[in-house]
Amino acid sequence: MRRLMISWTIGFALLIAAFFGIVVLLNSTVYSAHGFVSSYLDALARHDATTARELPGVRAPSGVETTLLTDGALGTIGDIRLVHDAARAGGVHHVEFSYKLGTRHEASTYSVVQTSSFLGLFSRWSFAKSPLATVSVATPHDPRFRVNGTAVSSSVSSIQSQPFVVFAPGLYVFDSRSTYVIATPVAVPVTEPASVTPVRIEAEANALFAKEVRKQLSEYYARCAKQTVLLPTSCPFGKSFSNRVVSTPAWKMVSDPPVAIGPDGNSGRWFVPKATGQAHLTVKVQSLFDGSISTFDSNVPFEVSYVIEVAPNDHLTITSVNR
């Protein structure tokens, strides 16, 4: 009986030792400071923005757009490795991890602090400083853009930059691809928590934009040419005579002004620079001096330039300007 009691005691002691050994092991790995940071990075790597955002201490600055804190906006993170986990005063740990953003090798350091324990045994942690960062996006030519394929739109003036909160680390590829506009992709690595990274998206008019503007202007010129007056209303061409006109003026288009489209500075509009077209006018004119009648049958050159606004639904508003 005594031998049995000794066996039971030894077994129980071994069980207790094993239990506390597991507690120590878990507190040095899963429930450690670097284990906490690892769970954040792993969530980003598997594009799980919800889990990453719900971790203690992940806080977005007040009043800053959070559109990019989504699964679709996350880039690719790989080869995540612990570099060091250093304890500092006040229970704060500085944890550094290395990783790859695309083909780039990067590293980030996070400050975490122990907040409590689970069941009195397992450590709980929180970010002492939020791991989020900010990208300040300037869209001088078109408010619409994409981040890693996720459609976004700036809500500020074209001359301003709008801040967006993002997870750090992350590789964010900015571009624009709408009906009439395209922008070359810009890859922006964000590695430092609380950092602010400026981004400028230089959109350009695509071939369809120029084609559609040519079409609309050609229809406009054709409507002008149908007016049987010397000075067609709200039209870029016309002709005046000092003598008397004795027949109905007849216009026809000879050549439309060429169309080239570029950004209108930082106004958020587009500009068609000054170009020359030719309209043809046929009309009979009577001299006030001797009463003779002659026919004016010639081309009439005219110059135009335009600004174009693109609405969110891609409707084009083309306005003539004198530049």
Name what the model sees in each region.
Residues 26-72, 204-243:
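Core segments of small alpha/beta cavity-forming domains
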Residues 179-209, 297-305:
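Structured interaction patches on ligand/partner-binding surfaces of diverse proteins
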Residues 4-26:
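Hydrophobic membrane-insertion alpha-helices, especially the h-region
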Residues 19-33, 37, 127-142, 207-210:
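Amphipathic alpha-helical assembly segments used for oligomerization, scaffolding, or translocation
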Residues 211, 215, 219, 223-323:
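Membrane-lipid interaction segments
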Residues 90-92, 167-171, 274-278:
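Extracellular Ig-like/FN3 beta-sandwich strand-entry sites
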Residues 45, 49-106, 234-263:
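Short solvent-exposed beta->alpha transition segments
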Residues 100-188, 301-323:
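Short beta-strand edge/turn micro-motifs at domain boundaries
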